[in-house]
């Protein structure tokens, strides 16, 4: 239910409804595309994961939404077309610092003049982002290769410099994310024996438990945050 409420707020912020032409950057497992299609939107969703394409298409078909949802194995830079709304959930953290301007420029070009872009992004303080982007931590080595968590300052500066999009509003989900990580870790530990039968060894299990606990501590302490962030063209701001 919490995940569905999160998705519904993203769709609300993007003004997704009947006839909306929606582009999703980062398919996940297809839930956002399905819920958007249930509102009457026409959805195109992009991912670089063949596994996500296969499972998301299967879930879309099971939901009876194949006529409204197109899932493509494609880089966002090659999306093409024009859209009423673009939504991207925790994608920016994975593409690296040097790709951020191109990411926002591409989205700006894909949006129709009255369109909205809504993203969910994990953030860290700007000084820590600057200090960490040239380091190579264990998380970058084992969990998110080449990834970097942005700061709110970086996001604002890049969108102002490289696009016509401006912030409409932001909403922090930090406390909810910390609790989510606690529950993920709890579920992971309860199923640890099952995971070993799936081929995940003890080294991986300890690393993943540490990653979940480390991340939870980051959100609870305020070192990390997570925002749903809504952008519109300057003339479209309320």
Residue positions per predicted region:
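Conserved SAM-binding loop of SAM-dependent methyltransferases across substrates and taxa
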Residues: 29-40
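Conserved SAM-binding motif I beta-strand of class I
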Residues: 42-47
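Conserved SAM-binding loop
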Residues: 56-57
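A short acidic, Gly/Pro-enriched loop at the edge of an enzyme's catalytic core
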Residues: 77-87
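Conserved class I S-adenosyl-L-methionine
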Residues: 18-26
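Substrate-binding/catalytic lobe of Class I Rossmann-like enzymes that use SAM or dcSAM, i.e.
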Residues: 123-238
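A short glycine-rich, Lys/Arg-flanked "PGG" loop and its adjoining helix->strand segment in the class I
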Residues: 101-113
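Conserved beta-strand signature within the Rossmann-like core of class I S-adenosyl-L-methionine
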Residues: 114-122
